[in-house]
């Protein structure tokens, strides 16, 4: 699953979310 916009942390999802590349930055 992709991170929601505004939830990016250095281009990655927060620990409580699935790790991966965030879309939209």
UniProtKB/Swiss-Prot annotation:
Coiled coil: none annotated. The keyword Membrane does not apply. GO terms for biological process: defense response to bacterium. Its main location: secreted. It is found in: Secreted. Keywords: Antibiotic, Antimicrobial, Secreted. It comes from Meleagris gallopavo. It comes from the Eukaryota. This is Antimicrobial peptide THP3.
């Amino acid at each position: 699953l992709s991170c929601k916009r505004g939830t990016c942390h250095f281009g990655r999802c927060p620990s409580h979310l699935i790790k991966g590349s965030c879309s939209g930055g």
